[in-house]
């Protein structure tokens, strides 16, 4: 799938030391939302910071999920393991890497 215009939600969370596994279990939603096309999780080398990147079909689909009870429950489950959280919502595109 080509992403000429993507809607991208990026969250960064600093975790309490030693809580990565518990956080990972809490982070996974009980159901994946309609409109989410892709999702990635990236951890720092020490496991104390996680970046979540999700690609959405529209700004509206992301907003529906953000305001949903599924997301509210997920956030409540993650809260005991999170020290700090930052988030941003962006539009972007996939860059083509030239063949070598």
What name fits each language-model region?
Residues 1-100:
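Short S/T/G/P-rich N-terminal loop/turn motif that feeds into the first structured element of a domain
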